[in-house]
From Swiss-Prot:
<dbReference type="InterPro" id="IPR017655">
    <property type="entry name" value="Dehydro-deoxyglucarate_dehyd"/>
</dbReference>
<dbReference type="GO" id="GO:0042838">
    <property type="term" value="P:D-glucarate catabolic process"/>
</dbReference>
<comment type="similarity">
    <text>Belongs to the DapA family.</text>
</comment>
<dbReference type="Pfam" id="PF00701">
    <property type="entry name" value="DHDPS"/>
</dbReference>
<keyword id="KW-0456">Lyase</keyword>
<dbReference type="InterPro" id="IPR013785">
    <property type="entry name" value="Aldolase_TIM"/>
</dbReference>
<dbReference type="InterPro" id="IPR002220">
    <property type="entry name" value="DapA-like"/>
</dbReference>
<dbReference type="GO" id="GO:0047448">
    <property type="term" value="F:5-dehydro-4-deoxyglucarate dehydratase activity"/>
</dbReference>
<comment type="pathway">
    <text>Carbohydrate acid metabolism; D-glucarate degradation; 2,5-dioxopentanoate from D-glucarate: step 2/2.</text>
</comment>
<protein>
    <recommendedName>
        <fullName>Probable 5-dehydro-4-deoxyglucarate dehydratase</fullName>
        <ecNumber>4.2.1.41</ecNumber>
    </recommendedName>
</protein>
<dbReference type="GO" id="GO:0008840">
    <property type="term" value="F:4-hydroxy-tetrahydrodipicolinate synthase activity"/>
</dbReference>
């Protein structure tokens, strides 16, 4: 898939990022992961992010990322697979190349590890990754790697395969500046934790797709909510926010790192155990798992 085709695909519908399955020894459980990606592919995601943030990219070593990508590609059918990459520039380039070789249709460039840097340094980082591959790249603005509108415009000029911008910062005024300046030169993706609760504000800012974590365990509900957003069905949007997302977020916010842990827990509730999260994350307690099961059951009954 060439970069322009990927750009069109990403903008065509709802996105998600599968969790990465581990066995009890915390090794990649490829068989379970394949079954999960195959199941998700039946719910019309526009693209899936393999080894993304919810896929515990930060806990995978560089050799595991192409394994995850290859496993996803084997069962995803026509659904594009976008691989995570990141860390320092040399490691990000290494992962990018190996993911492309493994069959990834594109890359999501996560922030470099720990380091805060000036715009020139961030530009050099993104440019190095883009120029190392031929597939499309989406840059993820968040935490310690926040590119401004001028920097993104410059990168778009210098890197033809930079096709997307994903925002995980939440400064809607900055997002509006970027979407207004760049227009259709990029596809714009919402990337806040449980982005559904932010989606209406982002839609108004010109960001009409996002990556849904809960798609992992309630894909039909996630698509119903997204469809209501796209069609302006405010009653359905409000119903799902109040009945599912607000109590879900309250549970997610109980502990640090639960934005990932609670997604794996959701699959566990369904009887599709993805295995534990890797340290330093922690799994939900039995009491929290029961609370999540009640939230899911209530949403299904609505």
């Amino acid at each position: 898939m060439n970069p322009l085709e990927l750009k069109k695909a990403v903008g065509s519908g709802l996105l998600s990022f599968p969790v990465t399955h581990f066995d009890n020894d915390l090794k990649f459980d490829e068989a379970k992961y394949r079954r999960h990606v195959e199941w998700l592919s039946g719910y019309d995601a526009a693209a899936l992010f393999a080894a993304g943030g919810t896929g515990e990219f930060f806990s995978l070593n560089p050799a595991e990322v192409p394994q995850v990508v290859q496993a996803a590609k084997a069962v995803a059918g026509n659904t594009p697979i976008i691989s995570g990459t990141g860390y320092g520039t040399s490691i990000a380039v290494e992962i990018a190349k190996s993911a492309e070789k493994a069959g990834a249709d594109g890359l999501l460039l996560l922030p470099p590890y720990l380091m805060f840097a000036e715009q020139e340094g961030l530009i050099a980082h993104v440019k190095a990754v883009c120029q190392s591959v031929g597939i499309g790249v989406i840059v993820y603005n968040r935490d310690n790697a926040i590119l401004n509108a001028d920097s993104i415009a410059r990168l778009t000029d210098e890197c033809p395969n930079l096709i997307g911008f994903k925002d995980g910062v939440g400064d809607v005024d900055k997002v509006i500046e970027i979407t207004t300046k760049l227009q259709d030169r990029l596809v714009y993706v919402g990337g806040m934790p449980t982005h559904e609760v932010y989606a209406q504000a982002y839609f108004a800012a010109g960001v009409t797709t996002y990556s849904s974590a809960v798609f992992n365990f309630v894909p039909a509900l996630a698509q119903r909510f997204y469809g209501a957003l796209r069609t302006g069905d405010q009653a359905t949007v409000d119903e799902i926010l109040k009945g599912f997302f607000f109590p879900f977020v309250a549970l997610r916010n109980r502990k640090k790192g639960y934005a990932v842990s609670i997604i794996k827990a959701g699959l566990r509730v369904l009887g599709q155990d993805p295995g534990p999260v890797r340290p330093p994350l922690t799994d939900l307690t039995p009491e929290e798992l029961a609370a999540l099961a009640q939230i899911i059951e209530t949403a299904k009954a609505a």
